[in-house]
Amino acid sequence: MAKQVVFDREAREALEKGITKLTEAVRVTLGPRGRNVVLEKKFGAPTITNDGVTIAKEVELEDPLENVGALLVREVASKTNDVAGDGTTTACVLAQAIVREGMKNVAAGANPMFMKRGIEKAVAAVVENLKAQARPVETKDSISQVASISANDPQIGALVADAMEKVGKDGVITVEESKGMETAVDVVEGMQFDRGYISPYMVTDNERMEAVLEEPYILITDKKITAVADLVPVLERVVRTGKPLLIICEDMEGEALATLVVNKIRGTFTCVAVKAPAFGDRRKAMLQDIAILTGGQVITEEAGLKLENTTLDMLGQARQVRVGKEETTIVEGRGKEEAIEARIAQIRREYEESTSDYDREKLQERLAKLAGGVAVIKVGAATETEMKEKKMRIEDALAATRAAVEEGIVPGGGTALVRAQTALDGVQAQGDELTGVRLVYRALEEPMRQIAANAGVDGSVVVEKVRQSGDSMGFNAATREYVNLFEAGIVDPLKVTRSALENAASIASLVLTTESLIADIPEEEPPVPGGGMPPM
């Protein structure tokens, strides 16, 4: 396909137009009085959202040169979303502000490479200032405030804070669609994995079709059990104690399964067998997690252990085990606290060193099962469109809350960025480098200006008033009043604000240093031929 090549001012102007078009679509959503954007779908109902990255991903411009600019801002939004999970609209607004002011200076003859260095120096100074402004998040109220601001809904804030309190900062919180109208939090206590009983004859509660074992012994092995002779020694030892037995194994069939089922039906002995969770190396790791949680050992020939030689002290124990058709939950494992803590520390190290998103997600799940638990927020709404919009806001709120717990919070409403302007006074720069610093200085006001504009107030007036007021004072766009932002609960996670600025400055610097642009020449679609026979 043939390419078109444009240079100099024409290239930069095309990029700026694309950036502006995408940012104009996104910026209307910023702040508590921000509006929604409707996204048309090829199939099904349209999506209504105020999530910056979701809107950015939908924008594709007709002009291929302008579309390159839009793609660059989309990259800003996506990167910020990946790192912090929120702040995507702020990132787009900051990027556009730096590009807009920078283009004027490049057109006036400023050197873009020196401006880029100035931008980098300014961003480093601002980030240090933001860190100094940050406060740690320690209370449930603080978590609720962060989530409420992100989702623009106090009810969602309370839900997220409730879920966080129940499972702890290492817990996993997932968001699912509910079948009803209510939005609620369900917490799974203990360790749960997605494997149920091997045979339905093993259930102890026929009405609910689940097996509930009180104070059971737990046999954990990676072996497939078919011969009953392998199990007899350990079964005899467990029967003497009068306690039930849970067997976690690769699979069970043949006479071993038949023997357990017959004994259960006769009422001689209660034993439930479930398949081991996951596959391959992840299965070995999860079996080891279960063993440490319950104070047992994994009976594996790799470690020189055989089923027929298993003793009671090799078995795990728990207060209760519930086994359903598709999941097993171990409640209050009897493992040693120090062993569990050591395992948690090991998984956390693996999580920090892992580069794969999938592996990190699975490690986070394992960490939650050992450390905290799993909470599920079930989202209810009157229509599917409303449910999807609400689900997106809850996911954003969750990401913002995790970011806040990680790095702390700063004053919200764009105030932290305006306060950070003072850090730029001490940046050592001259000439075009100083111009780059000034670009960032002006851009730091842009989120507050936009929040004020969306609330129907003059942005310049708001910025000036905030600049002259005390450290924690800022503009509450919801009530159009000037308040102490920490006391009013108007806060942003430091990680979100920092990531938005860093990613915006990175892309904006590259746009300003662009001197040529290469894009596809759109091909005209040939007309569709008419029906009938082709010509002879």
UniProtKB/Swiss-Prot annotation:
GO terms for molecular function: ATP binding; ATP-dependent protein folding chaperone; isomerase activity; unfolded protein binding. It comes from the Bacteria. ATP binds at T29, L30, G31, P32, D86, G87, T88, T89, T90, G413, N476, A477, A478, D492. It holds the Pfam family Cpn60_TCP1. One of its GO terms (biological process) is protein refolding. The keyword ATP-binding applies. It catalyses: ATP + H2O + a folded polypeptide = ADP + phosphate + an unfolded polypeptide. Keywords: ATP-binding, Chaperone, Cytoplasm, Isomerase, Nucleotide-binding. One of its GO terms (cellular component) is cytoplasm. InterPro entries: Chaperonin_Cpn60_CS, Cpn60/GroEL, Cpn60/GroEL/TCP-1, GroEL-like_apical_dom_sf, GROEL-like_equatorial_sf, TCP-1-like_intermed_sf. It is found in: Cytoplasm. Its EC number is 5.6.1.7. It is an enzyme of class 5 (isomerase). Together with its co-chaperonin GroES, plays an essential role in assisting protein folding. The GroEL-GroES system forms a nano-cage that allows encapsulation of the non-native substrate proteins and provides a physical environment optimized to promote and accelerate protein folding. Belongs to the chaperonin (HSP60) family. Forms a cylinder of 14 subunits composed of two heptameric rings stacked back-to-back. Interacts with the co-chaperonin GroES. This is Chaperonin GroEL 2. It comes from Moorella thermoacetica (strain ATCC 39073 / JCM 9320).
